[in-house]
């Protein structure tokens, strides 16, 4: 049994995740040892959890466009890790999905990150990921954090969620696709080459 398999077993047997495990729901993340780019988001949505495949929706199509990669590279190259702040769908709230459960990322991310020694860039998708990884260096709102993305390179790059629901935000912030996405595609191409 590999170290990652031991971690997965520990996640599934953890009392915090017992209800999911009893209902046959496995933790949803990807952590290939060869990963060079780590994508940290909030948590799987209900459709994602049911489909058992992360970023396999309209948001994922847009994310791969932003990265400048195809599905084959994204899912099967071993160069992308997907490590949400919670590996399970946290449930529905009044205005959307509930936030990731407290303490989940703190408990499991450090163990899993040790298993991926080649990660060169971590993409922080959305405010929860940015607050968790950037801490006090994150700005008061997502727009300011994303706008100052160069301050966090080369280790981190904050992104707005690629959801079609963010179309208005993208229209209000043309610099995102004009500058940040151009830089992101260059960085990703450099990391993936060879």
Provide a role label for each language-model segment:
Residues 45, 49, 64, 130:
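Short, electropositive, low-hydrophobicity segments enriched in small/polar residues
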Residues 2-9, 13-21, 86-194:
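Glycine/proline-rich loop-helix segments at beta-alpha junctions forming the active-site rim
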Residues 53-100:
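Short, surface-exposed acidic-centric catalytic microdomains
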Residues 1-59, 189-194:
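Active-site and ligand/interface coordination hotspots across diverse enzymes
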Residues 45, 68, 161-164:
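Residue-level marker of positions within ordered structural domains that often coincide
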Residues 24-33, 61-74, 113-114, 148-150:
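Short amphipathic alpha-helices and their capping/turn segments at secondary-structure boundaries
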Residues 39, 80-82, 156-158:
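Conserved beta-strand scaffold positions in the cores of enzyme catalytic domains, especially
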């Amino acid at each position: 049994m590999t170290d990652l398999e031991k971690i997965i077993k520990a996640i599934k047997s953890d009392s915090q995740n017992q209800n999911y495990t009893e209902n046959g729901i496995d933790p949803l993340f990807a952590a290939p040892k060869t990963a060079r780019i780590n994508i940290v988001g909030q948590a799987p949505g209900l459709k994602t959890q049911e489909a058992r495949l992360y970023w396999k929706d309209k948001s994922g199509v847009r994310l791969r466009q932003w990265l400048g990669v195809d599905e084959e590279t994204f899912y099967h190259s071993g160069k992308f890790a997907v490590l949400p702040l919670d590996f399970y769908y946290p449930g529905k709230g009044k205005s959307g999905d509930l936030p990731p459960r407290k303490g989940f990322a703190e408990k499991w991310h450090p163990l899993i990150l040790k298993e991926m020694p080649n990660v060169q860039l971590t993409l922080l998708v959305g405010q929860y990921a940015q607050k968790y990884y950037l801490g006090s260096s994150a700005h008061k709102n997502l727009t300011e954090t994303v706008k100052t993305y160069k301050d966090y390179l080369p280790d981190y790059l904050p992104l707005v969620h690629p959801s079609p629901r963010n179309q208005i935000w993208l229209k209000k912030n043309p610099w995102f696709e004009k500058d940040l996405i151009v830089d992101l595609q260059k960085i990703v191409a450099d990391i993936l080459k060879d």
